[in-house]
């Protein structure tokens, strides 16, 4: 079994910048020293991340955002949004970055220089038009049927639950009461293989190395100490259909995708949207629970989905909103949210397939060499600042609620 660590590159870079701004430290990427510190931190972060995962992996694949095909999709303006609201994909992030003391122009320039430098030292997927999430999904799909490869994706985004399979898991570097040391997200089948072996497997011996996984799930990103993780406390079962359904109906604030229903308070001062509790209440009227299995059934059954939307209109007190309006909005959100090869324009898929073919031998046969990062200098191209699929099915075509 060959195991590969795949890295969500933009999260990795943001995490590195966050490290430089912890506590009383401030790094706004303005001065020469601040820029050098950031590039040094990126390099150190690769070394430290490899050191933490070294006992469990053979290779690393770095995936980075490079523009996004989603920005080419005509934005959908919900009926309840005022004309002064930004509605384009991730457009809401612009004002936040402009108001930040951190120079994000320098951030992206420095990060891009780092990417170009490490391309000579490791496998880097960097394709104009594809985000890191797209690349991670496409790589996971390519290797889906290969029983000799296992992927561990280092990330924080819960959307990436959609790429979890029997041979693909997440290590989400989050901090919560139940997961103070981050959490592993695995498939239901993988959980059963590791923790719920049947009597026959126990008697005859299982082909799965449960000791390996128990050691992996007790790893720490900081030092060699072991940490305790158990189901629902640092080990989660992936719920890709639930993630897709909730984000497509409720919207996704971080990506500037809106709820399919929205309304004002009686005073007009507050704005409401569909929440998970609204969906739970709507499902309860049909004697359903908000489970992964039910979400899967809804997403592949037009009648169930239509009934849910009709019930949500009543639950949210919006009975007069046309189904056609909601259906158009929902299809837009599904296209933007669902990590599926079928949603990506063909020209970007063809470019990915070419890049993957070029890397395929290296992915399967090479081993990551950390020594090339020790003492590495990032090549700057600007002398003025010379410092350093099938995760879930394609469901957009069956959601015609007209």
Task: Mark where each language-model region is.
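Noncatalytic, basic helical substrate-engagement surface that gates or grips nucleic-acid strands
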Residues: 2-150, 160, 164-186, 338-339, ...
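Conserved SAM-binding loop
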Residues: 153
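Non-catalytic nucleic-acid-binding/docking modules located in mid-to-C-terminal regions
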Residues: 48-66, 83-102, 120-124, 165, ...
